[in-house]
Amino acid sequence: NSAEPGSYLLTAEEEALIKTVCSAFKRTAVVLNVGNIIDMKWVDRYQPQAVLYVWQGGQEGGHAAADILTGAVNPCGKLSDTIAADISDYPSTDHFGDAVCNVYAEDIYVGYRYFETFAKEKSKLSLRLWSVLYGFFRGGFEYKNGRYESRTYRFS
């Protein structure tokens, strides 16, 4: 991932599309079908009501995204990556893209481990995005009559 349009940064066309759609509609959900984290500063500029990272969902990814967007399922979950405020916040940026040798200078401190150990202030910069990106569920649910069957739980 490099700080270039079409990699970490949106292309001019992608950003123009988001701007146009967000300004034309009261409610906008931006679906990011990407294979890596991208710059999220555009969220502050265009303020979509929802952002859904669908990552690489495979054969059923489209159905899963449709279920989330239509409210058939709850999108709560944990992010598999830390989405920092800037690409320079990631320690791997300094060593990315060498065609001859990959340098893993971060050791075990990749992703959330790095941010929780060495850069809590950098991850806090992204907290304002979490209500959009983290998948907070504002509803409620309860389980009744749960019982253990085999290796799964069954609820009614």
Question: What spans do the regions from the language model cover?
Answer:
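C-terminal non-catalytic regions of proteins with extracellular/luminal or membrane-system context
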Residues: N1-S156
